[in-house]
A protein has these predicted regions:
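Short, charged surface segments at domain edges that flank catalytic/cofactor-binding sites
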Residues: 1-39, 113
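Short Cys/His-centered divalent metal-binding micro-motifs
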Residues: 67, 71-94
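Histidine-centered nuclease catalytic patch
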Residues: 29-71, 86
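Short amphipathic alpha-helical patches
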Residues: 34-37, 78-85, 98-102
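The −1 position to Zn-ligating cysteines in a subset of zinc-ribbon hairpins
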Residues: 20-21, 53, 74
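Short, intrinsically disordered terminal segments enriched in charged and Pro/Gly residues
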Residues: 1, 94-117
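Generic low-polarity alpha-helical segments
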Residues: 7-10, 14-15, 44, 57, ...
Length: 117
């Protein structure tokens, strides 16, 4: 099995286990195979930031592997934002940070928040 196919299977399984919601922010996600797209079909525009990605809890750059124990499903925005920081926060610390920002309405854009309401 190709590495990318295996990672897609792991991401899809993890997204299903997470109820189609991002590991960090809890927003619903969509993917090419339609997982999580139910309930996001309010119109033709689906925010790219809510695309489901495979998030490595321990980044590959730090030796993280592609196994189920190291991969969760995260929206594109949370995944990219975590890795754009100077120092990548540990997953639980980053999750707390993100959820605090979500509660204060300062995480996803207003358009994305309106889209999922």
């Amino acid at each position: 099995m190709r590495k990318t196919t295996r990672l897609v299977e792991i991401r899809t399984a993890r997204a299903s286990e997470q109820g189609g919601r991002c590991f960090y922010c809890g927003f619903p996600m969509w993917s090419a195979n339609g997982l999580g797209a139910r309930g996001l079909q309010k119109g033709k525009w689906i925010p790219a930031n809510l695309q489901c990605t495979a998030e490595h809890l321990l980044p590959r750059s730090d030796g993280g592997q592609d196994g189920r124990e190291n991969v969760v499903a995260a929206c594109r925005f949370c995944n990219q934002t975590r890795h754009r920081r100077g120092k990548v926060l540990p997953p639980n610390q980053y999750r707390e940070h993100v959820q605090g920002r979500v509660r204060s309405g300062k995480w996803h854009s207003a358009a994305v928040r309106r889209f999922v309401e």
